[in-house]
Amino acid sequence: MATISSILPCHGLLQHCSSSSSSSKPKFSSQNLVQLQSFSNGFGLKLKTRVSTNPPLLKVRAVVTEETSSSSTASSSSDGEGARRLYVGNIPRNLNNDELRTIVEEHGAIEIAEVMYDKYSGRSRRFGFVTMKTVEDANAVIEKLNDTEIGGRKIKVNITEKPLEGMDIATTQAEDSQFVESPYKVYIGNLAKTVTNELLKDFFSEKGKVLGAKVQRTPGTSKSNGFGFVSFSSEEEVEAAIQALNNSVLEGQKIRVNKA
């Protein structure tokens, strides 16, 4: 097969190529490439039709980007759903979604109001969530409804993105101090973290006269230790509670009930 070098004499296309002993730099012009293109078609070579040896001028355009200020970012995030979503706790067990909406919407525009229910028993978990339309509405509801009474119960209203222990520590300590001791008492283990003293009392009241109910918590906090005690007025009620409620489900968890 014929080669390009055999067709094009050195003094033609490659006359400027230097020998290995030459100290001068090799020169190669765009005119040479144009000549080579005309011959390359017959050999199936793919060469660009023209290559400029003069590099084009680079046009550099400065692009100015506008940074979003931290204050505007904070403002945007504060208008997010988390800042408008309220936790409403310690509500009456018979309060439903519509009634919760009616109570809250007196103080601001609402998007969603929902009471939480236990998926196993279908009983109200005594708390719900309300999403307001604006942060201002949410703040107004907290101001007007937090620590007010509904159905004889003092409710707690907070923004959900604030860290919540589930209850106010002072309230929890006050409830614990009201626990009535009795020789007729049961131990309840494997309690869900959401179980409150009031919920525990209501759950066991179906099986006897409950004198006191207490979820054991880490001292100085409202963090549940996962167990509690319920006191009754008689031995018969203790036996009835153990027989009926041991291995029953409370707040989605199977509890253990034994004599304390």
UniProtKB/Swiss-Prot annotation:
Q: Which Gene3D superfamilies match?
A: 3.30.70.330
Q: Name one GO molecular function term.
A: rRNA binding
**PROSITE patterns membership:** RRM
Residue ranges constituting the RRM domain according to the UniProt record: 84-162, 184-260
Q: Name one Pfam family in it.
A: RRM_1
Question: Where does the record place the region Disordered?
Answer: 63-83
Instruction: Give the UniProt subcellular location, in the record's own words.
Output: Plastid, Chloroplast
Biased-composition ranges for Low complexity? 63-78
Q: Which InterPro entries match?
A: Euk_RNA-bind_prot, Nucleotide-bd_a/b_plait_sf, RBD_domain_sf, RRM_dom
Per the record's keyword annotation, is Ribonucleoprotein included, yes or no?
A: yes
Q: What is this protein called?
A: Small ribosomal subunit protein cS22
